Amino acid sequence: MIVRDLQPADLPAATILLDQLGYALDEAEVRARFERLLAAPAHRVQVAELDGQVVGLLHVFERPALEKPCEAVVQSLVVDANCRGSGVGAALMADAEAWARARGLLSVALYTGVSREPAHAFYKRIGYAQAGTSHLMRRSF
């Protein structure tokens, strides 16, 4: 398995993975978002490639804050449904942690939906613990 930067040629596979995560987007929208992230140096988008196929996707970014130390946040992590349990997710999270350490950050945080129990079990297995419960509030315009 290879963990590497997401390339434009990977966007069709990334679109499929995001759909598996529950985000039905068209490839043009994923491409536009990827291009915006490329311009943001505090963001990292990686893929896991296995036998020439993209089977995992990670987006992590550095989040500065006034009220707490700056930390890395995993915005998205998804492994192809056919490859879950094979170490792909752990490899991507290890990449996120190495990136955070290299930037001098002291922690990696992530948010996971309350109903995603298999994801909760995965994160606990790799050393993460629940640090709180919150509600997402949004106002669209």
PLM region descriptions:
Residues 1-3:
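Extreme N-terminal starter segment of soluble prokaryotic enzymes
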Residues 5-70, 75, 80, 93-95, ...:
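Acetyl-CoA-dependent GNAT
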Residues 79, 85-98, 121, 125:
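Conserved acetyl-CoA-binding loop-helix of GNAT-fold acetyltransferases
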Residues 93, 100-112:
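Conserved GNAT acetyl-CoA-binding A-motif
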Residues 109-119, 138-140:
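Conserved beta-strand-loop-alpha-helix junction that forms the acyl-donor binding cleft
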Residues 124-133:
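Conserved acetyl-CoA-binding loop of GNAT-fold acetyltransferases
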